[in-house]
Amino acid sequence: MEEIRESSNFIHDFVAEDIAPGGRFAGKTVHTRFPPEPNGYLHIGHCKALCIDFGTAEKFGGLCNLRMDDTNPAKEDTEFVDAIQEDIRWLGFDWGDRFFYGSDYFEKTYELAVGLIKKGLAYVCELTPEEFSAYRGDTTHPAVSPYRDRPIEESLDLFARMRAGEFPEGKYTLRAKIDLASGNFNMRDPVLYRIRYIEHHRQGTKWCIFPMYDLAHPIQDALEGITHSLCSLEYEDHRPLYNWVIENCDVPSKPRQIEFARLGINYTVMSKRKLRRLVEEGRVSGWDDPRMPTLCGLRRRGYTPHSIRDFTDRIGVSKVTSTVDYSLLESCLRDDLNANAKRVMAVLRPVKLTITNYPEGQTELFDVENNPVAENAGTRPVSFSRTLWVEQDDFMEEPVKKYNRLYPGNEVRLKGAYIVRCTGCVKDADGRVTEILCEYDPETRGGNTPDGRKVRGTIHWVDANNCANAEVRLYDMLFSDPEPDAPGKDFIDCLNPNSLETLTGCKVEKSLEDCTATDRFQFLRLGYFAPDNKDSAPGHLVFNRAVALKDSFKKD
């Protein structure tokens, strides 16, 4: 993994204090965890948490566990478990042998819940959610519960029968007995367990009661020896409950919860529910559609692990929620690919160019640089012949002002080859240009002018006698509105109808037939491109535009 520049954050400050002499974790190894819920694919928003969890452990020479938070059986699937692991490995992080499932702790969590009942700190409640809301009180009136003083033995019996499947969903819950007058409503006897008759992706039908996140999460952290439980800001007012569970359950360690602000990016949505709707309604081709903010979508589009880690590093860690410009993500990729991507020539909207005074049947090879900003990138041989492909918009029969490319009488430099002068064109019956006619100056091999004359325009080209055909997909923002998620909007109405343009019959250098899914290229003058890791195959090359050469962000 390439070096990412160092940036300070308050989490690292807290961790440094905790492991210093006299700190709460003095002498201990820093131990974090990344606990995704396997009910969808990871997206760029998760990436911030992922990089914070793994990055914090990495910085302090510690460990980071990967734990599937599968305590809620609804919509959890092994498909997502596998995809999450692939995404994390792709980013360059490693959890070693510390891969866990939250459901692995179901039995222990149940035992600890029984312990809370025995201590008089939990009770079985018969109130429905609607009824409890009525009993819950408000900021000036404490809550009340008719079941709060249920005898311990009765709660133990009912809880065991809940596990045995004797009651329907919604009949009973297990509640913590904390403080019905607390100003933090999360502490007003929160639900710890509920009845759900639903098959679990790993446990099958073994369990019909499932722990709530606020109970399961701190117990799992403590059982794994986590020192720092790093989570998003929405859990800040859940921290007292997290600490209450740790203090009152017989667990082997006492982790510290620290919260940070979530990542928001304009021109996108990151709700799993909304992303799932895009997939299910066929508005994108799948979770890995290159327009999606999922990591598999970004990878397919052409994003690199370094660019995404650089992005999370640049935005930093904060307690203040903010929205980041999508252009920053593009900039990180552009910087990475500018330094590392091989330069090649591709013609997306081809028109034939014939050099009328070039010998028929002759082919030359030119050594063309692979990357002018990379010292050891070297060169590659590119073939050149009488017939080339060039871009349609590199020719105008009647040029506009300051147009320096091909038009009758004008000279241009063919990148790395010769200088040619346009002598005319050939049109079809409808008046469309089908061929551009030029003459070359044989004294200008390599693009130099021995007589010192100035040639303003330089265009790219592909040898028509030695090239490959390709399909090229030009991607833009999935949404045309910078705030598709804003209140009062249906995000579907904000979809960009021009987010994808597919071009067929494109012409690329012959060498690209041997490219692999991990290769990244700069198509000269056109942008940065990557082979589509799903659709591209020998004999059918498909390239995705990962990012334009310049900032495409729409500014007011």
Language-model features: where?
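Active-site cores that bind ATP or allylic diphosphates and position pyrophosphate for catalysis
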Residues: L66, D70-N72, G115-L275, L333, ...
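Conserved short loop/turn motifs at secondary-structure junctions
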Residues: P36-P38, R67-K75, D97-E107, E130, ...
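N-terminal catalytic cores of NTP/NDP-binding nucleotidyl/phosphoryl-transfer enzymes
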Residues: S7-A16, A20-Q85, H200-S232
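Long, charged, mostly alpha-helical binding arms that flank functional sites
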Residues: S253-C332
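Secondary-structure transition/capping motifs at alpha-helix termini
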Residues: P21-A26, G55-L63, R89-G96, K119, ...
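Core subunits and conserved enzymes of cellular information-processing
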Residues: Y235-R239, N243-V245, H306-R309, D313-G316, ...
